[in-house]
Amino acid sequence: MNEFKEQFGTTCRDSSGDLEICTKDSSIIVAILSAGTALGALLAAPTGDSLGRRKTLLLSVGIFCLGSIFQVCAQATDMLLAGRLLAGVGVGGVSVLVPLYQSEMAPKWIRGTLVCAYQLSITVGLLASSIVNIITANLKNTSAYRIPLALQLVPALILTAGLLLLPETPRFLVKKGRNEEAGLSLSRLRRLDITHPALVDELQEIVANHRYELTLGPDSYKEIFVGSPHLGRRTFTGCGLQMLQQLTGINFIMYYSTTFFDGAGVDSPYTKSLIINVINVVSTIPGLLVIEHWGRRRLLMIGALGMAACQLLMASFNTATGDDMKKISQTILVTFCSINIFFFASTWGPVVWVVTSEIYPLKVRAKAMSVSTASNWVLNFAIAYSSPFMLGEGPGNAAFGPKIFFIWGAFCILAVFFVWCMVYETSKISLEQIDEMYERVNHAWNSKAFQPSWSFQQMLDEGWSPSAQPPINHELQTTTTASSADTTLGDGDSSSITAHNSNRNNSTSPSEQNKAPPVMANVDFSY
């Protein structure tokens, strides 16, 4: 917008002599939001574990609103930067806590679809912003950019209104030892009476799982890298997915693809942005529909392969064709750019948020997710800051053009191998059963065949020890110990549970004998 350039342009001018935003100013204006989001993501963990998911979300929205007001009122670049930094802190908190809240309150059969809706909401917001920009583009005063900046407050206020009606997540309440409140929260979310057997069983499993987790180690930041079971592996998986989401080049593509439409006869940058965002929204919907049926691993690998093919083809065509085939080359770039956006929006866009909100145990879920989300925003900052230099021409700029897609394509190929080796299939099992899967399944590529065979409540009821050893005289006990059959399993914030081993009938049915025994005595709890 010319009004924005005139307000915040300083010394740089375009070929016609009009003020424009210098490359270095453009880089910092765009990238400082990502710096704020990285900070906000890291702050979300201690605040979310202290105040709760819901209250911290409200706080994050408030910080975002303050940043938006700064941007609307900005008369100079410094105030605009301060506003974007504050808004980024708010967005960072929201980006951690919304998927976290969704995963902790959703039943397992719709958890993936519900968290995918987070990404759908982002794409709808991008589309709405494109429409607003088209409407205000022809205004001849600062309202041309102040109105779009002010309208950021609308979704923030809608989110605030919704949060005032929603309960705190039952898992956070269990973490704080407020089990009665957790039952009431779960009752509201499931629309079941608090005495309903299914609700009672679910709450008991959450409580038992959390107490078991605490016997394996504290809920510290160190624990997310070295704790049991395999927390280092899980943290590496989450951070790797979040960084690879950025290294697929999607933000670079969303920025650079507008230039491809020049060769397709589309001149307005606002119309280009609208077309791209329509593709983005429509493409997100298939991911919501198939994530529970196809699973997380398959979607991620299909998406990475599809993006790799598109990007390598774009780079190859641009390198191989000369000026005499420029029109054909531009058409190919537009086509494969759109297909690439489809593959990302239906797979890596939503599914990464689903996986990273599921794979961590309750005791460190907020901390681990904040670290993985911060890694996403750090890469986002680096790419946003460097993009103008990679795209620009002249001294100090790389002028890569579409050849940069060779790099993004290579990262997409790396992403396929990363998913195959590191990402466990978490669909159709509860968050508590994911802990069991990481204990029993050594390799991610075997995780799809995993079937839960026991519950943490069962372990407490039958007197299992904190090291996951069955009690003496239990039919699954394979070693003789001199310890008592009475086993206490608890945590410092709540009363301990003492389970007494009763006399059991030695005769078991064939179906019971065929169950995989929950023996975890020889499990390697290291990374």
Model-derived features: where do they sit?
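Alpha-helical transmembrane bundle of multi-pass membrane proteins
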Residues: 1-187, 194, 210-527
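Cytosol/matrix-facing amphipathic helices and coiled-coil assembly/linker segments
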Residues: 199-212
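Short intracellular "coupling" helices and adjacent cytoplasmic loop segments at the cytosolic face
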Residues: 188-202
